[in-house]
Structures are given as C-alpha cells and as structure tokens.
C-alpha cells in the first residue's frame, strides 16, 4: 500500500482493571476509500476510533496521519479528522446553524457562511437551519452530527454507528451522502451493525474481536476467500432427518423438513452437485425446486466471530 492517509501501529489500550480493549492493532487506511470496521459490542471499535480522535489515550502504539506522528503535531492532525460519535451530544437549545458553525470555529476555521450553507443543503438540513436541536427527530439530529463533523473540512471522517436510530428512508439518504463524500475525496471509516450496508458500500473490511483485528481485506477478496456456496433443494415431501445413506455429504435439513441445504466448495474442480442429485434419485427423494445462495458478508462475519470465540 502506497502513502496511506492513516497508519496505526501497535495500538494498545489496557485499563487498570486488567482489561485489554486493544491488543497491538496494526492498520493502514487508504486515501479516499470507505473502510468498514466490523465487530460485536465490546470488540474495541469505539476505543480505536476514540484514540485516533484524541478522546482516549493509548497505552502503547502510534498513529500517523499522512506519515506524520499524531502527537508531534496534534492540532494539525486532529484538524484532518472528523468524528460522528454514537452518542447524540448537542446543546438542545442551540439552532442547527449555530451548532454547525460553532463546531467549525473549534478547529480554528474562519467563519464562512457560504460553506455552512452548502454543507447544510448537502445534508438536507437547510430548511431546519433555524430549528433548535431539541425540536429535531433522532434521524435529523444524526445528520446534524455529520454536518458538525464535516464543518472544518476534514480529509478523514469517522462514522461510529451513524445509522443508529435512523429510519430506513433517512438511512438511505445518509449513505448517498457518504457516497458523494467519498467521490469528493473524503476518506471514510465506519462502524455499523447493518452489515448489509457495509457489504454494499465498503471498499475494504476489517473485523475486530476482543481487541484484535482477526481479518482485513478487500471486500470482494474476503467474500471470495471465505464465502461459501449453498445449494438449496426444496423437497416434494418433508423428511424427518437426513438419511444415513447421505451421511458423507455436507447436508442440513431446515424448514420443517422441506428444505435440504448442500454446502459446496465453489473453487473446487467438481462441486459434487450432479452426484448428489443422482443419489437423491436413487433414494427416490423427489424435489420441487433448486437454487444456489452465496454467503453474504454477514454470514462471513458471524463465522469469523464464532470461530474466534471457539478458539478462545
């Protein structure tokens, strides 16, 4: 990888209780990409983000922004980063306009009403500019948080569970905004519980569990490497269990005995499907329909976390 915009080296966070929230994490973020950091609750996602954003102090390790040590020039490095936290923390009595403008000033940026206007319009907040924060819905407050994070024109934007509390329509609008930001050159690192969104939007994916990065790759490469393909057979008559004669096949039975699943290696020279169908015919097991299903990113995520817990 050439010239990552953000480099994390040996990042570790340990508390006096003995808990290790991060265990020597190494991560490079490419300029202009959307990177999805996935993990269960308590995995270390928010801790990592908070360290990079200067909210939490690391026990060990370093953060480089454009190759420069984060601590060596904190003000400059922090001005390059925007953060949309999970919590909706705003002054309830301030207007949308004041909230976003004040955030810009905190980073030493001069007043620029034209830029604030453009930002609010991009996020469909212009009509709400005079509204007080306490008058907004949860979804609109989330948009204001994004506007705050972008007010000082950062190169890197962290989105920590940005879809939390947002309805489906607003969520779609929000992700469209994210796509446009990425098209404009903003580097985006997001965490989300909506893994199907990460599958749709991310260029690369990292999975963190118990403070360790257990997988990181191009999204498509990860899905090709770890994804599995399943043949789903809709049976004409339900079965109580998989017959002993089919014990050598990787079969599972669901749907109250109506649905037979065969998991096969899509990279193998032979999938075995033709042989399986012949054996079903020999056993006089009739079927009504066939279909195949490729593992989703969520399937892969669940398997990775399960394997990690089993190994632990």
Where are these regions (language model features)?
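A short, flexible loop at the N-terminus of ABC-type nucleotide-binding domains that lies
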Residues: 1-8, 12-24, 74
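Conserved ABC ATPase "signature" region
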Residues: 101, 105-128
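Conserved catalytic motifs of ABC-family nucleotide-binding domains
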Residues: 153
